[in-house]
Design a protein with these regions (language model features):
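Amphipathic alpha-helical coiled-coil segments that mediate homodimerization
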Residues: 1-21, 72, 174-178, 194-199, ...
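GAF sensory/regulatory domain recognition
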Residues: 8-11, 19-64, 68, 90
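Signal-transducing coupling segments at domain and membrane junctions
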Residues: 69-74, 78-107
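A short, aliphatic-rich beta-strand micro-motif
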Residues: 106-114
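Short hydrophobic/glycine-rich mini-motifs in sensory/regulatory modules
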Residues: 113-123
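Amphipathic alpha-helical "output/dimerization" segments
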Residues: 115, 133-154
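Short beta-strand-to-loop transition segments that serve as allosteric relay/switch motifs
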Residues: 122-132, 153
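… and, occasionally, acidic/histidine-rich disordered N-termini of signaling adaptors
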Residues: 163-209
Length: 209
């Protein structure tokens, strides 16, 4: 998918060991993981009952959703500002989940994905514990790539909106034709009465015709 390709590009160009992309779900006010690749120690608190096994942790992360007011991902989405984390052990926003090597947090870069000034998601890359921290240069690379990613995502969203609108218009035309068949073609003749039928179709009334 597009997001997987963007994720791989971010990992490659910043020489990271793993990357993740999350998008905002506006209906539920959460960030949902859409792409996860490589080694990315989760910077959020794992569920207490989750076994510290690599495959179990990865699965938990891959299908995770985070409220916008929680985790470093939510903080970046809400502020609209990127973060370069070079000292995770002294950063209260980064949760250390355990002594296992694959859980030990190293350096991170978090970048908000924006369409104009609206944050639509967060992209992040990570390096393993003990490896050299990300530099300002790599932060700038991640920021530039994320800008391109946001533009590509915007094109996809715009295309989807056009297709959805076309489908709704088609359904509306069908509803309009059906409604036009409702008025009777002929009215009964009643002595002393003048009968007639009139119909005006309107759309957008409670989401229907």
């Amino acid at each position: 998918t597009l997001l997987d390709k963007v994720n791989e590009s971010l990992i490659r160009e910043t020489q990271a060991h793993g990357g993740v992309i999350l998008l905002v779900d506006g209906f539920e006010d959460v960030l949902a993981v859409k792409s996860l690749s490589g080694d990315f120690p989760p910077p959020y608190g794992l569920p207490e009952d989750l076994p510290h096994k690599a495959i179990r942790v990865e699965t938990n992360f891959r299908f995770a959703q985070f409220p916008l007011n929680e985790t470093i991902f939510g903080a970046v989405a809400c502020s609209g500002r990127g973060e370069l984390i070079t000292e995770p052990l002294s950063d209260s926003r980064i949760v250390q989940n355990g002594p296992e090597d694959f859980l030990r947090c190293g350096s991170y870069i978090f970048i908000p994905l924006k369409i104009k000034e609206t944050v639509i998601g967060v992209a992040a890359v990570a390096r393993r514990y003990g490896e050299a921290a990300f530099s300002d240069k790599e932060y700038r690379i991640a920021s530039t790539l994320s800008d391109y990613a946001s533009a590509a995502i915007k094109l996809i969203y715009s295309h989807q909106e056009v297709m959805e609108y076309a489908e709704l218009t088609k359904e509306g035309d069908i509803a309009c034709k059906l409604q036009s068949t409702l008025p009777p073609k002929l009215l009964p003749s009643v002595p002393g009465l003048s009968l007639g039928a009139f119909q005006r179709i309107a759309d957008g009334i409670c989401g229907d015709y």
